[in-house]
Amino acid sequence: MEKLSYKTLENVGYDGYLLKDAKEKVLQFGEGNFLRAFVDYWFDLANEKADWNGKCCLVQPIAPGLAEMINEQDGLYTLHLRGSVNGEKVDDKRIISSVSRCLNPYQEEGFNEMMKVAASDDLEIIVSNTTEAGIHYDPSCQFEDKPAASFPGKLTQVLYHRYKNNKPGILMLACELIDNNGKELLKCVNQYIEQWNLEEGFKKYVNEECTFCGSLVDRIVPGRIRDPQEVARLEEENHYADPLTDVGEVFGLWVIEGDEKLNDVLPFKKAGLIDKVFVTPDMSPYKKRKVRILNGAHTGFVLGAYLAGQNIVRDCMHDEVIKGFMNKMLYDEVIPTLTLDKNDLLNFAKAVSDRFNNPFVDHELMSISLNSTSKWKARVMPSFLGYIDEHHALPKCITTSFAFYIQFYRGYELTDAGLVAKRPVGNTYTISDDRDILEFYYNHKDDSVKDLVHAVCTNTSFWGQDLTQIAGFEDAVVQTLTEIEEKGTYEVMKECL
């Protein structure tokens, strides 16, 4: 069967939206599943809805990559956005035509083409998602390298070439999942300017004429379809083969931190995507919303749900007690501590239920349980402390989630793989966390409930503070943990409702 290309689509009589030729307005570092299901999708919608008439030229950030495959398909690929919307199963298919080509800068021709795009009058935006490890300063990179090994090194080379060609400053959108991604990237570029002794005029160009924006990205992207039968079925339906087929969830949100005038460059407001992709002077409330509601919900209920016999998130959403516990925690104890518009928070929480109920994604509770100690501190504890400040009382569900956390970590055997514990339904499971945390729980495996709770609550290396100083908390956790031993986590959840 013919691979996806403009010619193939013409041959099969495809009549959906396509943009074959347009200016390369975006240089994108990263060609993986996430960016193609997220950034390139939004630009594709902007082309259709706002007549933006722009293409994204992709760059492989590391030597092994997809450039050859992408170019073989004229930059085209099929995107499936799958999930649940208001409880209804959704599978939206779209051919994305916002990508012009993909360059491999580790080949001479690819490097030269990257520099040509850098100096182009058409270029307006640079986007990156080079993984959490991508934004780092590597002093071994040299200006003469073709290319510099690190992404910030490559970006410095690109910006310098643009500067030397007297082209205007650029808008830089960092999508990496680290705090202050835009600022951290700019910091790395400035380090290379110093290391490579580049002129003061270029430093001024980077820091004053270019705009480095942080951004918050939110979409789960499972990536390619692995089931050969489904691949065969889709090829039959589409009348073409597409090894670059990508899958993401329906929900998507891109919050870009910066001045309102960025909307003069970005096409998303004009395209009517303002609730999905928008500019805000401060993205921290949106980050807090995601961490506390989406991630906090996961950490708050999954350990108790796993001990109650569940294995995947979706099944938890079909259990009235577990879902009820999650909702009570979110609506009564988490949302009241957040400062964004109330309707905005409620809509986000409602979307979380749909996302957790995704019929296409088997999200395992055990995968979410990884590093639950630091997750509880980062995702749940701020809501816990905020609730206490406001109400001068303990939040019942969050306090219960802390007891679930301790119960989950009550292992009996320490191995190289982790701390082994036994589930009430009979099977064993292995807890994954920092070694010192696992050793702590192993060393306290024979403690009484009272002693264990005291040891956990007073471990300031876990929580950054002594939790026994919070009035009534230690006693409440002891009581809840005792009830868990007697009745199990499911009954304890039920009693919270």
Enumerate the language-model features and the residues they cover:
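Substrate/ligand-engaging "lid" and interaction regions
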Residues: M1-L497
